């Protein structure tokens, strides 16, 4: 079982007003009965979702609840059960998943966007920019100014790593923020971030959450996962995020606000 807070979503996009005098906007993600089964049974779901565009959603759930798989489904990288109804950024999934893949970026996923500890920050960024550029365009070496322009929206007032720094020397917060920077180089409309609590210290993790809030404030829809079921309650937010609690898998627990 899974529970979404706020309300469950209908299949059709829901109009959301952002403030007085502003036109309504559709949800970036809407789902009904979204679920995924694998060879060993239920991976996640069923869950209903309504994630407004330009907001932060925290997906909470214990190990085995399917947090990573749910995020990859929203980003068009995994295909849900056939009975699921899912629309992301105006596209029906899985039929239009290529369009979603172009507009959705991922970060924090073990085995997918891991950093190479033995290379420099500059070379890491250059490799990412080369991947995003047309095949015929040569990407020059990344200097500190180029990196600053790319990373400033993510790092904010936090001091930037030097481009000559080796990834191995970055602390866990800077490493996570670098992964976010690489993902946002795609200029996505949707960013999904897995396992935010790989930054183990609660106080230091709050820095990552504040930067994800800043990203969402620019208009990018952000969905990020964490295993701690009280993460939202004990984190100080500039604006209360949306919350989805997954309670599937071998360690199933009821959602905090379940009756």
List each language-model region with its residue ranges.
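Conserved N-terminal strand/loop that marks the beginning of ABC ATPase nucleotide-binding domains
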Residues: 17, 23-39
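Conserved beta-strand
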Residues: 31-34, 42-52, 84
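The feature captures the beta-strand-to-loop junction immediately N-terminal to the Walker
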Residues: 60-62
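Conserved lysine of the Walker
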Residues: 67
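Helix-to-loop junction immediately C-terminal to a conserved catalytic motif
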Residues: 75-76
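Conserved ABC transporter NBD signature motif
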Residues: 83-92, 100
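Q-loop/switch helix immediately C-terminal to the Walker
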Residues: 103, 110, 117-137, 146
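Hydrophobic anchor residue at the start of the ABC signature
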Residues: 180
